[in-house]
Amino acid sequence: AKDFMARHGIPTAAYGKFTDIDEAIAFIHDHGPPIVVKADGLAAGKGVIIAQTFAEAEAAVRDMLAGNVFGEAGHRVVIEEFLTGEEASFIVMADGKNILPLATSQDHKALEEGDRGPNTGGMGAYSPAPVVDSDLHERVMREIIEPTVRGMAADGAPFTGFLYAGLMISPSGEPRVLEYNVRFGDPETQPVMMRLRSSLPALCLAAIHGRLDTCTADWDARAALGVVMAAGGYPGSYDKGRAISGLDAAAESGCQVFHAGTTLADGNVVTSGGRVLCVTALGNTVADAAARAYRGVDVIDWDGAVARRDIGYRAIARERESERQHQDG
């Protein structure tokens, strides 16, 4: 993906690939910490080090190349500039040529409030993402999404399906690509789908037949927010088979409860994974959607259930600031 972006002029973090320790360390000294050192390959999700000092970065390189602590995955390292700013998820549909953007969203990857703790698959999300205003939306389409779809076609692999660009928006408003996925995001999908009024199967059929240029997507103007409820211990080891209560009460409160790590045992819904449920609600504002979603979270329970209590905090802060400015004006 990094080579693809370099080839097609798509903005991303500066990077280099190395098999030689001295060359890797020279790159580190050229760019300086904090810097990201990755084992180039599969390393059970643990082959990524965010080094805060030169010493940490050099140690990571030596471990991965000389010590080879990650086995085959560590025979080469990718070293990337560490990007700062605010993340956003930008998902579109493509039919090989035409592009239909879907609603913007933002997820929360860290386990704990304030974006602290280990990274997870995602502890909650909301849509739309206020950080992506109309000007930035146009820029992302022009500088990232359109060159990506054109680039895949030019490389002989025209793409039909869902394209997910994970973006970092710098403090000055510059979008850069963190990652691509050729699927929807989880948990971004849940709030995005809550807002979609158009027929998803009809849009998928249009993409398959190369007719996305004839389609538009109709969105509920309200915000949607989803809170992931996870098993205690996740993303590490956790218990399974815990009986879940309160699902009917959450539905009666107006929430949509999306199941992930659940199964049926003797007629009862029990936990079967790390991320168990995503409790999602619509609201006139992100703050309103959050309040409704947390009402659902508060009536669902099982032994060891955990959830972040601050999903949507960036957008809620923006809403409060906007309201304050309106009152002052």
For each of these PLM feature ranges, what is it?
Residues A1-T12, E23-D30, V36:
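Conserved N-proximal alpha/beta basic substrate-recognition cap immediately N-terminal to
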Residues T262-D266, T271-R324, D328-G329:
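Generic C-terminus detector
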Residues G47-T189:
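Internal nucleotide-binding/catalytic subdomain
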Residues G32-F54, V192:
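Conserved anion/nucleotide-ligand pocket segment
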Residues E112-G114, T214-T216, T262-V269:
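Short beta-strand/turn micro-motifs at beta-sheet edges
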Residues E23-A24, E56-A59, P235-S237, N284-A291:
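Short, conserved charged micro-motifs
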Residues G45-G47, L225, G273-C278:
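Short amphipathic alpha-helical segments
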Residues M141-L163, N181-E252, A265:
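Active-site "cap" helix and flanking loop/linker of ATP-utilizing ligase/carboxylase catalytic domains
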